[in-house]
Amino acid sequence: RCGEGVVIVDAFLYAGERECLDIRVHELAGVVGFHVALECDRTFTNQPRAVVGVDAPNVLHGVVSLGEGITDPWQREAVQRNTLLLGLETCADDDIILLGDADEIPSASAVREAAALAAEGRQVALEQLLCLYYVNNVEFTQRWRGTQAVRYDMLKRLTPQGVRDRRNLTPYAVKDGG
């Protein structure tokens, strides 16, 4: 735990997106207690990949080794996402967990707003720009409900992948999420 009271923890899947990590850590400095970056030793297409590692302040880095056994890419991603719980074991039930991918960078102001709603026991979607392949290739007809904010007790009950699966169902959203 980082200090007294409710802690906001930023937990995300990481695949070596160093620039995204740097932006994320800088943007959320002073807002989150710590970050949890979880890396996998396999690509989405099940190819072996070298673990990049993380050298950033306030970031707990973990590596999950899935081997070749899980061949479905979405199942592999779900297992990796659910493994984020291991990096959150020191959290209290009322702590707020941000859950997303490394490139789904929330704004500090959106995190504050989402945390207030999540503290009331709600799953909150941060509506973010949907960029396809490149940061300057923006899909303007829709927003991406990537990063989610939930209390830790809700995350344990639903699982990280369960929260991800419900991201478009929650009526609670921060419109300019990052």
Residue spans of the language-model regions?
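Short, conserved active-site loop motifs that form the nucleotide-linked donor/cofactor pocket
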Residues: 8, 59-60, 123
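N-proximal low-complexity "stem/linker" segments adjacent to membrane-targeting elements
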Residues: 1-30
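Short, solvent-exposed loop/turn segments at secondary-structure junctions
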Residues: 15-18, 41-43, 66-68, 103-105, ...
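Short amphipathic alpha-helical segments and helix-helix/interface helices
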Residues: 22-26, 85, 111-115
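Active-site-proximal specificity loops/subdomain of glycosyltransferases
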Residues: 40-99, 108-109
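Conserved catalytic core of nucleotide-sugar-dependent glycosyltransferases
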Residues: 104-177
